[in-house]
Amino acid sequence: MAVKWIAHIFNSRVIGISIDEQSRGTVELGEHTITADWVIAGDGADSAIRKGLGIAFDGMTYPERFLVISTTQDLTELIPDLAGVNNISDAEEWLVLLRTPRHWRALFPVDGTADAALLTSEAAVQARMQRVAPLPVGYPISHVTLYNVHQRVASQFRLGHVLFVGDAAHINNPLGGMGMNSGIHDAVAAADALASALDGDVSALETYAQTRRSTALDFVQAATHRNWEQLQERDETVRLEREARIRATAADPVAAREYLMTSTMLAARPTDRGSDVS
């Protein structure tokens, strides 16, 4: 397959799409319009292409919002044995601490109806971080983000010559880090399916749509929601039973490998022509 040309158009927002009789898509990008035989829509959770084609995006919104605080303070200086990613289950307030290249990031669940200005104020942010680990001089805060959290999947991942990938196709809570990774899997599988279609195997497109949607529903949505349920569990008996299961899994090489294959998404990685391995 020869690529005739590639063009990058930056600082443009997708406004909409129209489909002609030959199934070609014309994508509107503000000052630009592009007509193509095939379209891979990766324009995010608010996908103008998905909405323009009338594809449903069903699911649910969590009752709480997530508050993310980024600091340049090295948390390993304050908390011994801290890992790069830490899911902290607590009967009063769960949280996530994770290392990024330039920051430590703390994620907290907060009241979905509380005033956003109060939640993100300097005093409130410092108070939350001080509960994580006391720091008398205060935390250097790089940025604060407050957002709603959803679990949603498009009713179809393909409409004619349009394929959907990433957040345009499915969104989930960030617990487990599966959102971006599954979106990358989508892109790999969609590119492979499109290459097959251009070589004459159009059935690869439907295989892509069905397998990636099933993966989003049965694997990503299920795993991330389970992570949320486990972190916010308050029943001490249930919490202790889960800890015992985790320790038993870690002590069993076969069970540990199976667990890691799932949690790292290797068990759901795309293979040739959009299919998945189990």
Kindly label every feature range from the protein language model.
Residues 193-278:
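C-terminal helical "tail/cap" subdomain of flavin- and related membrane-associated enzymes
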Residues 123-130, 140, 144, 152-163, ...:
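Conserved flavin/dinucleotide-binding core of flavoenzymes
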Residues 2-15:
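A conserved beta-strand/loop element that lines the FAD pocket in flavoprotein oxidoreductases
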Residues 12-15, 24-26, 38, 42-145, ...:
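Conserved FAD-binding catalytic core of PHBH/FMO-like flavoproteins
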Residues 18-25, 158:
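A short, glycine/Asx- and small/polar-enriched loop/turn
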Residues 41, 141, 147-221:
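Conserved mid-domain beta->alpha element of the FAD-binding
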Residues 29-38, 42, 159:
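Core beta-strand elements of the Rossmann-like FAD/NAD(P) dinucleotide-binding domain
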Residues 19-22, 50, 173-174:
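Short N-terminal helix/helix-N-cap motif within the alpha/beta-hydrolase-1
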